[in-house]
């Protein structure tokens, strides 16, 4: 977010032209149970800045000409693109089928990207996982042919780490809950400190 803000400020560009892919993708409420799995599969794409072709050269020059202090991945969005439509499938849902894409100029581009980035079959167990080249379990185990990945650095249902969608309500609620827990810990520790200080004075 900071890099986008600085980029648009320095180049005098409208921030509304530059979206992170994840801001334009939401998991359909009817499939909310799969939110964590979707976040795991799509996180790299979700954190990708979409750069319109018309601004691509200036943005590349700006990025190359400075130390960003962070990682930035950006995709050039062609002015005209042959739209890839995800193939219809039989025998179970694929990840792209449970996603809602924000209407607008980037909708076709996002749909095309999801055609190959979100073609994972949604499977309920390892037996099903073994039957599909690309699949993901509810617990977040991803399969891409022979490659398997499960990133459990954070719980699959931990909304603090979610990046899909424009609304931050779930993330804010999770962070507020964590803050309340930490404040409780601080209060308890302060009470213990006060008791120890009082004992020393006796």
Task: List PLM regions with ranges.
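Hinge-like oligomerization/junction regions that interrupt long coiled-coil arms in large cytoskeletal
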Residues: 2-184
């Amino acid at each position: 977010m900071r890099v986008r803000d600085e980029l648009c400020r320095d180049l005098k560009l409208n921030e509304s032209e530059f979206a992170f892919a994840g801001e334009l993708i939401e998991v359909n409420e009817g499939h909310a149970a799969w939110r964590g799995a979707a976040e795991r599969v799509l996180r790299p794409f979700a954190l990708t800045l979409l750069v319109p072709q018309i601004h691509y050269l200036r943005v590349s020059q700006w990025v190359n000409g400075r130390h960003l202090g962070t990682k930035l991945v950006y995709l050039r969005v062609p002015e005209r693109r042959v739209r890839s439509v995800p193939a219809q499938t039989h025998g179970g849902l694929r990840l792209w089928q449970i996603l809602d894409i924000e209407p607008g100029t980037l909708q076709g581009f996002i749909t095309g990207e999801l055609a190959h980035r979100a073609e994972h079959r949604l499977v309920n167990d390892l037996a099903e996982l073994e039957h599909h080249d690309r699949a993901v379990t509810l617990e977040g185990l991803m399969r891409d042919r022979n490659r398997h990945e499960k990133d459990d650095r954070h719980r699959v249902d931990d909304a603090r780490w979610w990046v899909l969608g424009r609304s931050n309500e779930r993330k804010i609620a999770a962070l507020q809950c964590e803050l309340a827990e930490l404040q409780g810990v601080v209060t308890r520790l302060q009470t213990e400190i006060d008791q120890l200080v009082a004992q020393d004075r006796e």
